[in-house]
């Protein structure tokens, strides 16, 4: 590669470095104590890839969470609540009260699509 090719490659790498940033951290509403109207937003720490909102009676928990732990057993154990509703999501500031009020579930829409698509594909392939 000549000098001109090296300059073009360097320019492309520079443009990619400027416009592509890695390490975007998810923003979630996070209140250390249960509250009914959490408005405190934080950038989640590394390893926390999901926002959680959980309601146990009148207590509402908003925080960063690990998607791998987004299930009833882990949430109820870590929050020390035996009866709760919860919603996990992976978009910035998606863990607000209306998610639970509108019938939020434990799985995001994308997760359901990712789970159902292979099953439909398998059924299609097996269909005579």
UniProtKB/Swiss-Prot annotation:
GO CC terms, sorted: plasma membrane; side of membrane
Keyword Lipoprotein: yes
Signal sequence, start to end: 1-25
Function of the protein: Potent inhibitor of the complement membrane attack complex (MAC) action, which protects self-cells from damage during complement activation. Acts by binding to the beta-haipins of C8 (C8A and C8B) components of the assembling MAC, forming an intermolecular beta-sheet that prevents incorporation of the multiple copies of C9 required for complete formation of the osmolytic pore.
Post-translational modification, as annotated: N- and O-glycosylated.
PROSITE patterns: LY6_UPAR
Membrane topology category: Lipid-anchor; GPI-anchor
Keywords: Cell membrane, Disulfide bond, Glycoprotein, GPI-anchor, Lipoprotein, Membrane, Secreted, Signal
Listed GO MF terms: complement binding
Species: Macaca fascicularis (Crab-eating macaque)
Residue ranges listed under propeptide: 103-128
Biological process per Gene Ontology, one example term: negative regulation of activation of membrane attack complex
Disulfide bonds: 28-51, 31-38, 44-64, 70-88, 89-94
GPI-anchor amidated serine-type lipidated residues: 102
Official protein name in the record: CD59 glycoprotein
CDD domains the record matches: TFP_LU_ECD_CD59
Location within or outside the cell: Cell membrane; Secreted
InterPro entries: CD59, CD59_antigen_CS, LY6_UPA_recep-like, Snake_toxin-like_sf
Subunit structure of this chain's protein: Interacts with T-cell surface antigen CD2.
